């Protein structure tokens, strides 16, 4: 059997019948853990590499010091508490060519959190937009 925590037939998935039910419904497994963490996974490209280096790691980290960027072969894995925001207009200036929020969205592989676009900005947030904070137009 595999000992990996995220593999098939590992952990609780190794169990069947009563053993599975006992662990699945155990008191310690009935707790919801609150998290403000958000994740953005971007496919690598020349444009995205520049955006990661100059916008996310510099300006983004200045706004949100919890941002962590990991190189995952063909992808950039970005995690932060609260929110990750990328302004496509700023990216266009950096790249020296037109770059819309839709050009950015083509490279979005995965997200954890609530994703939305507003104007030229793409945001992943842990907030309930419209409930925790008003979503305003620009």
Swiss-Prot record:
One of its GO terms (molecular function) is monooxygenase activity. It comes from the Bacteria. InterPro entries: MethMoxRegMmoB (IPR054955), MOase_MmoB_DmpM (IPR003454), mOase_MmoB_DmpM_sf (IPR036889). Keywords: Monooxygenase, Oxidoreductase. The keyword Transcription does not apply. The keyword Oxidoreductase applies. It holds the Pfam family MmoB_DmpM. Disulfide bonds: none annotated. The B protein acts as a regulator of electron flow through the soluble mmo complex, switching the enzyme from an oxidase to a hydroxylase in the presence of the substrate. Belongs to the TmoD/XamoD family. The soluble methane monooxygenase (sMMO) consists of four components A/MMOH (composed of alpha/MmoX, beta/MmoY and gamma/MmoZ), B/MMOB (MmoB), C/MMOR (MmoC) and D/MMOD (MmoD). This is Methane monooxygenase regulatory protein B. The gene is mmoB.
């Amino acid at each position: 059997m595999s000992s990996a925590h995220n593999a098939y037939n590992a952990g609780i998935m190794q169990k069947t019948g009563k053993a599975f039910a006992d662990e699945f419904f155990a008191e310690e497994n009935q707790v919801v853990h609150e998290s403000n963490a958000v994740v953005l996974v971007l496919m690598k490209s020349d444009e995205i590499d520049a955006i990661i280096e100059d916008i996310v790691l510099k300006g983004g980290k200045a706004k949100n010091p919890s941002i962590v960027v990991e190189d995952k072969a063909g992808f950039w894995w970005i995690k932060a508490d609260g929110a990750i925001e990328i302004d496509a207009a700023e990216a266009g200036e950096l790249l020296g060519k037109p770059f819309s929020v839709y050009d950015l969205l083509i490279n979005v592989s995965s997200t954890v959190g609530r994703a939305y676009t507003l104007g030229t900005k793409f945001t992943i947030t842990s907030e309930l937009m419209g409930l925790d904070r008003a979503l305003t137009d620009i």
